[in-house]
Amino acid sequence: MKKMKLRHIIIAALCIISTSCVKQKLETTYNSQENRIDQYIEKNRVVGGDTLRVVYNDGSSRLVTKEGEGPELTANGNIAFHYAGYTFSGSFSKSNLFVTNRVESATESGWTLTDEGSQILTINMNDYRLLPGLKAGLIGVKGGEECQILFTGKYGFGNKEFGIIPANSALLYK
């Protein structure tokens, strides 16, 4: 009986240790992704002598490549936009495209879009389809603004694989 209890205690302890190690590894992965995002922003922040504006919001980083005009998008507002989503591993690569409605991005990556596939997306910011990192990155954009929004896997698809996107992948949206 004592051996049985001891065995259960050891198994429970091993499970706790294993879970703790997995969580620590995941946090290390996200910290590494945050560092790569910061390095990417620093490397791409100055263009033609001009310093681009960077906005940080709830785990998301927005590098503004063209300023917009008018009122800022709110957390409950509606937005209509073209986009291209890429997995991000420290640098931008056209081959990492996983979704787009931008003809230019599709063409650059060797994709073909139908007329329907290139339609501008109109969506409410509370729509469940928006990833937390994308939503946080869009808050505050103005009409006509062009930007890159980057965030870790924690604010993307998390530990779920999604189509061709590996679990816990950092993402970049243009």
List the predicted regions and their residue ranges.
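Cross-family detector of peptidyl-prolyl cis-trans isomerase
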Residues: 5, 21-174
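Sec-dependent bacterial lipoprotein signal peptides
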Residues: 1-21
